[in-house]
């Protein structure tokens, strides 16, 4: 599954879903190309956003990376991620940004991302997020 290109496909997505369901924090995967559509998000991501399930999360965010971020933060975060990936041999990035939960509450998250090329989807980001509001 791992190598110079990540073999992300329907079979590996089922493995990722199983692993993701047991992770202690938020984990999601999205396409690097616009509209930055999500390919996967675990239950912990839904909970960070105050959503009960995938359907609520899709309704809230449009199931895109842009839809996950506070509108005022998107451009700066997007540019920062692109700059970090361009400079990083490991294709890693870090960002802090605001989100708007389903109940309207604004929260801060930290985001550790990794850019990977895949055969099935082209460039993707795998991302871990956690709510850091109480630490700010």
PLM regions: where:
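PAS/LOV and related PAS-like sensory modules
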Residues: 2-34, 47
């Amino acid at each position: 599954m791992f190598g110079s290109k990540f073999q992300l496909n329907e079979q590996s997505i089922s493995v990722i879903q199983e692993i993701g369901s047991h992770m202690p924090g938020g984990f999601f995967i999205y396409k690097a190309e616009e509209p930055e559509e999500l390919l996967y998000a675990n239950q912990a991501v839904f909970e960070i956003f105050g959503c009960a399930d995938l359907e609520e999360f899709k309704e809230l965010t449009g199931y895109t990376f842009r839809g996950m971020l506070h509108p005022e933060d998107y451009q700066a975060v997007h540019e920062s991620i692109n700059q970090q990936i361009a400079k990083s041999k490991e294709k890693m990035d870090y960002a802090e940004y605001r989100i708007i939960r389903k109940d309207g509450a604004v929260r801060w998250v930290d985001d550790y991302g990794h850019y990977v090329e895949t055969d099935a989807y082209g460039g993707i980001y795998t991302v871990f997020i956690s709510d850091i509001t109480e630490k700010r």
